[in-house]
Amino acid sequence: MKQQIVNFPITFPITLSGQWQSPSAVSFSSLSTPLKDWLLDEGSLTARLKKHCDNFQVKVIGEQQQPCSAAESCDLIKVGEPVLVREVILYCDDVPQVFARSLLPIASLTGEEQILANLGEQPLGQVLFNNPSLQRLRLELSPFVNDSSVVALAAKLTAQHASNSPLVKASVIPKQELWGRRSIFMLENKPLMVAEVFLPDAFAYQ
């Protein structure tokens, strides 16, 4: 079942078709020191963002159950496996900071982890990093360029934030290369995937 929650016109799902690679394969010489630091930070992104603002918000774009695609599959989450997809935007003081997409295998949503299927506007990271069993097994990075759906989303959000004008005017906002990261976590020995893309006004680019 598809559930779209965010209260402005964004088509769900956004999806993320990135060129994911391990940090060791990324040429960091072209990236700023702050961006590299945010990309490689092993702590809670939610907690770090909260330290930079007075008002932290999660706005849910949508949620739906679907088969895992080949592009997002891994050793622990197989192609075709039923997953709950959740897409959100993280805001700091009304500035869109991060687009996040999580894949939660339905098989992982058992026991205490059932709470992950009913987060609402509660940040996923807050739940994950409060659990001492959490392990990050893999971290991958990817740039996102002009033909990416997340860059198109960023242009709309930037237009809305900059002038509160109708989103149809978003085409006048210059697009930029964005960077994101994707992590495979184990929570109570149950796998899940979280991808986070830093939006144009993110602290990571400052």
From Swiss-Prot:
<comment type="function">
    <text>Removes the pyruvyl group from chorismate, with concomitant aromatization of the ring, to provide 4-hydroxybenzoate (4HB) for the ubiquinone pathway.</text>
</comment>
<comment type="pathway">
    <text>Cofactor biosynthesis; ubiquinone biosynthesis.</text>
</comment>
<dbReference type="InterPro" id="IPR007440">
    <property type="entry name" value="Chorismate--pyruvate_lyase"/>
</dbReference>
<protein>
    <recommendedName>
        <fullName>Probable chorismate pyruvate-lyase</fullName>
        <ecNumber>4.1.3.40</ecNumber>
    </recommendedName>
</protein>
<keyword id="KW-0963">Cytoplasm</keyword>
<keyword id="KW-0670">Pyruvate</keyword>
<feature type="binding site">
    <location>
        <position position="124"/>
    </location>
    <ligand>
        <name>substrate</name>
    </ligand>
</feature>
<dbReference type="GO" id="GO:0008813">
    <property type="term" value="F:chorismate lyase activity"/>
</dbReference>
<dbReference type="GO" id="GO:0005829">
    <property type="term" value="C:cytosol"/>
</dbReference>
<keyword id="KW-0456">Lyase</keyword>
<dbReference type="Pfam" id="PF04345">
    <property type="entry name" value="Chor_lyase"/>
</dbReference>
<dbReference type="GO" id="GO:0006744">
    <property type="term" value="P:ubiquinone biosynthetic process"/>
</dbReference>
<dbReference type="GO" id="GO:0042866">
    <property type="term" value="P:pyruvate biosynthetic process"/>
</dbReference>
<feature type="binding site">
    <location>
        <position position="86"/>
    </location>
    <ligand>
        <name>substrate</name>
    </ligand>
</feature>
<comment type="similarity">
    <text>Belongs to the UbiC family.</text>
</comment>
<keyword id="KW-0831">Ubiquinone biosynthesis</keyword>
<dbReference type="InterPro" id="IPR028978">
    <property type="entry name" value="Chorismate_lyase_/UTRA_dom_sf"/>
</dbReference>
<feature type="binding site">
    <location>
        <position position="196"/>
    </location>
    <ligand>
        <name>substrate</name>
    </ligand>
</feature>
